[in-house]
């Protein structure tokens, strides 16, 4: 079960984005976050998945627990391995390139030398299906496989 209790997120030490957010999501339950632009939907998901950039905001109060264990300070990769992830709707891939080339091209964005290979290996470890299809043309992947990519 995912439990969020009294979550508060502040941007730039002054802008209160989330205040008092509490929710329990049972295993297997499907939940939708609805709200106007700027309501905090993306911030909530980024806080849960560990992707809240420290330059964007800080969790200043509250707890985030999954199956009884705190995940608030956990590395995003460990959160994914525990079964929590955010899948974005849009797919931006190079359909004419291989899976391998797509992953390597994506790795060059704001990366230091050597980090591309490390990032590539990490993704291949997280998504064995992509590893099995690394030489395939990305445009021939299923929709779900394209989202993984």
Indicate residue ranges for each PLM-predicted region.
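Conserved ABC ATPase signature
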Residues: 96, 137-141, 145
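Short beta-strand immediately N-terminal to the Walker A/P-loop
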Residues: 31-32, 86
